[in-house]
């Protein structure tokens, strides 16, 4: 599972995030999406840790904490929704039987 980290400073690096999160356990991966046009960090990232206990400890400690002059928003990442996905489920082409 991944951790979503929001409201990051635009000057943050993967090493910065790794150092902070490694205080709570082993970090296995850090992603910092960048803007296609400018190449600048978009202000959020994702961190994966070795255990869910480490993730929970990091979320508990860092959500709402001030870091690099900003108040962090840290929680479990939700799966990415596919483009064009509609909420509510169901299908318009459902076959509900015949006569």
Swiss-Prot record:
Tell me yes or no: is Ribonucleoprotein among this UniProt entry's keywords: no
InterPro entries the record matches: Nucleotide-bd_a/b_plait_sf (IPR012677), RBD_domain_sf (IPR035979), RRM_dom (IPR000504), SLIRP/GR-RBP-like (IPR052462)
Which superkingdom is the protein from? Bacteria
Q: Which residues form the signal peptide?
A: none
| Record field: compositional bias (Gly residues) | 86-99
Keywords in UniProt for this one?
Answer: RNA-binding
| Region of interest (Disordered), residue spans | 78-99
Q: Which PROSITE patterns has this protein been placed in?
A: RRM (PS50102)
One GO molecular function term of this record is: RNA binding
**Keyword DNA-binding attributed:** no
Disulfide linkages recorded for this protein, renumbered to the chain, are: none
* Domain named RRM: residues: 2-79
Q: Name the PANTHER family on file.
A: HETEROGENEOUS NUCLEAR RIBONUCLEOPROTEIN 87F-RELATED (PTHR48027)
Q: What protein name is recorded for this chain?
A: Putative RNA-binding protein RbpE
């Amino acid at each position: 599972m991944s951790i979503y980290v929001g409201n990051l400073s635009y000057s943050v690096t993967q090493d910065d995030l790794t150092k902070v999160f490694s205080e709570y356990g082993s970090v296995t991966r850090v992603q910092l999406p960048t803007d296609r046009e400018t190449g600048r960090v978009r202000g959020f990232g994702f961190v994966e840790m070795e255990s869910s206990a480490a993730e929970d400890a990091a979320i508990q400690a860092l959500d709402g904490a001030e870091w690099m002059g900003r108040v962090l928003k840290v929680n479990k990442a939700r799966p990415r929704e596919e483009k064009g996905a509609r909420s509510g489920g169901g299908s318009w082409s459902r076959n509900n039987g015949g006569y």
